[in-house]
Amino acid sequence: MSSPVVLITGATRGIGAAAAVELARRGAEVAVVGRDAARVRETAEAARAAGDGAAPVHEHVADLTLLGDVRRLAAEVLDRHPRLDVLANNAGAMFTARHVTAEGHEETLALNHLAPFLLTALLRERLAADGGGRVVTTASTAHTGASLDLDDLEFAGRPFKAMTVYGTSKLMNILFTRELARRTAGSGITATCFHPGVVRTGFGKNDGLLYRAALTAAGPFLRSPARGARSLVWLALDPAAAGLDGTYVVDERVREPSAAARDDVLAEGLWERSEALTAA
């Protein structure tokens, strides 16, 4: 049996790096995606060591805050990987201030939602080719209490509060997963998302002194990246996860997300807005 091919974004630190290493250790063919070439190489080398040559480990460099880079990455993946079994949409960040990318999108929206939405759209046929592809997206319990304004996804007309914006992006991840499952029903693709727990990682480096202080105080209660990556690895490889289409998972168990995250009308509206924003 050939090794499953798994593409992981945000794979140069934290959950993504830990998942890449564990997937390689389990015999998967891993494709590491990150913005920094040196860090991509570092993760890839760690994965190669863990896999002990059982399967190749590939390196891809892309800035996923830019949709142009997402398109370039997708073209590169399609060119280099004749088969793709799992797309792990793991890249994400929280920002304390509102930044607009060179393409005109608020940075949190661009990285946390539009990038995985577009990358999935561009790789969807390859994932479905063998009738068993999986899309695993890193969400968060931060979605709880978040609401979504389809007329202001960019937070252009509202106060920019880091946790609110981040939580909204995680709500989008769950709605995206739900709608993707609906739209790909019968294709063989399984779409899931998960909460990794509060993980000790470099995630908060863009998040301001107050947020970093809170993480420092919570230090003894934080999970290791390896523990945080466990659900990602399980959803990517375990046969039992193939039947969990459209679900939200916490600690390898299906959980019910917020009411907003279960709103199918909202999910469809977000999908349509996302198609317009990405020209997908």
Regions found by a protein language model. Give the residues of each.
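Canonical Rossmann dinucleotide-binding motif of NAD(H)/NADP(H)-dependent dehydrogenases/reductases
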Residues: M1-R35
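A glycine-rich helix->loop->beta "capping" turn
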Residues: S2, A50-P56, E76-N89, F95-V100
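N-terminal Rossmann-like NAD(P) cofactor-binding module of classical short-chain dehydrogenase/reductase
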Residues: L7-I8, D85-A88, G92, L109, ...
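The beta1-alpha1 cofactor-binding region of Rossmann-like NAD(H)/NADP(H)-dependent oxidoreductases
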Residues: A37, H60-A75
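Catalytic loop of short-chain dehydrogenase/reductase
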Residues: G92-H99, E106, A128-S187, H195-L210, ...
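C-terminal helical subdomain
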Residues: S169, C193, T216-R255, R262-E268, ...
